[in-house]
């Protein structure tokens, strides 16, 4: 157990930006982190420090990350957690919270831990990298119809489709589809909470050490900050053990919202035909028609100028970018990405094969 600092939050936000493949919005994430440390000092706890039957809640978002209008606020995340805890009828102590996956927003979710010293930040995620569907963060439960989990979602604004609160109990896959449709109805995004999950389950099925991994990467990035794009690119690549797939001007960015997912392709003029397939996350990369990386490999696009990642929806044709890929065995992953069923929607939306390359069954 250790007390987290704002420097940890800065590092977690920077590292989370990469593990989230650019999603989350760094400035907004840092602003939320500042609020956290104005309120209190959360503590980071590893799973090894907890009892097996201790319970952990997940905090996450649902919807399209490219949504531009702010439709959710920190209070919505706190309310979702409150609703999920109230609806839980199990036994054991709820000792902490964790995020579903990393992003620049990660430290902002520590607000509840700063407000309530009895809730620790747990050094685990449902998945240690961004994922396009809640089912991928289901830690292996997406296809289980015999296990019911409480999920709550809150968000929206009154003058834009209205504000909603939803609480549901049922199989993760079914309820996740309901929340995704609800996020579309409110304009694009909701803040959500689900669980709780016992520590013994997280030790086997969660992305153990995901928070520490973000902080380590972020610390390397902060050291490279101000040293130029190549220094930042090198810090990210070397820390994660990744490789460069190519670099050059972005030839096209055909990404649009479909069924409340950001879907499409990016094409990079790297001297070869480098195509990145997008479904909220970078799901696959092809060079001259040959697959070179597939989710859950981490594919990241970095601006050549400063080495920083930005999401697919914000890339502009002509911008010079660098494409990195990090092998899946170098990333903390949850069990959910190994389920073939969770790739159904991305495969359908993209029209490409993922399961055969993803090592899922």
Language model feature labels by segment:
Residues 10-61, 307-329:
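N-terminal low-complexity or amphipathic/hydrophobic leaders
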Residues 51-66, 136-182:
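A structural-propensity feature for long, helix-poor, extended segments
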Residues 213-268:
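Oxyanion-binding "anion nests"
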């Amino acid at each position: 157990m250790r007390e987290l600092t704002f420097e940890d939050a800065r590092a977690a936000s920077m590292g989370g930006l990469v593990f989230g493949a650019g999603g989350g919005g760094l400035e907004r994430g840092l602003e939320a982190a500042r609020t956290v440390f104005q309120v209190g000092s959360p503590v980071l706890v590893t799973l090894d420090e907890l009892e097996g039957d201790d319970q952990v809640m997940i905090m996450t978002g649902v919807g399209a990350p490219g949504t531009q209008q702010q439709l959710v606020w920190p209070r919505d995340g706190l309310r979702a957690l409150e609703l999920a805890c109230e609806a839980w009828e199990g036994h054991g102590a709820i000792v902490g919270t964790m995020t579903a996956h990393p992003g620049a927003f990660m430290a902002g979710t520590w607000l509840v831990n700063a407000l309530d010293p009895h809730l620790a930040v747990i050094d685990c995620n449902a998945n240690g990298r961004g994922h396009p569907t809640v089912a991928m963060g289901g830690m292996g439960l997406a296809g289980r119809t015999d296990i019911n989990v409480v999920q709550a979602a809150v968000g929206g604004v009154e003058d834009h489709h209205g504000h909603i609160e939803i609480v549901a109990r049922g199989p993760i896959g079914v309820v996740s589809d309901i929340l995704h449709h609800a996020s579309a109805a409110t304009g694009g995004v909701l803040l959500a909470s689900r669980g709780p999950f016992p520590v013994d389950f997280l030790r086997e099925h969660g992305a153990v050490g995901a928070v520490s991994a973000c902080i380590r990467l972020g610390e390397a990035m902060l050291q490279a900050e101000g040293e130029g794009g190549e220094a930042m690119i090198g810090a990210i690549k070397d820390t994660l053990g990744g490789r460069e797939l190519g670099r050059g001007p972005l030839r096209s960015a055909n990404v649009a919202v479909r069924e409340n997912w950001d879907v499409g392709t990016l094409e990079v003029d790297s001297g070869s035909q480098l195509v990145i397939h997008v479904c909220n996350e970078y799901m696959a990369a092809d060079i001259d028609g040959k697959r070179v990386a597939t989710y859950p490999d981490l594919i990241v696009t970095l601006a050549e100028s400063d080495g920083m990642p930005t999401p697919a929806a914000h890339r502009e044709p002509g911008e010079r970018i660098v494409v990195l890929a990090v092998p899946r065995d170098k990333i903390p992953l949850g069990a959910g990405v190994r389920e073939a069923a969770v790739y159904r929607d991305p495969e359908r939306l993209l029209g490409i094969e993922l399961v055969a390359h993803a090592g899922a069954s």
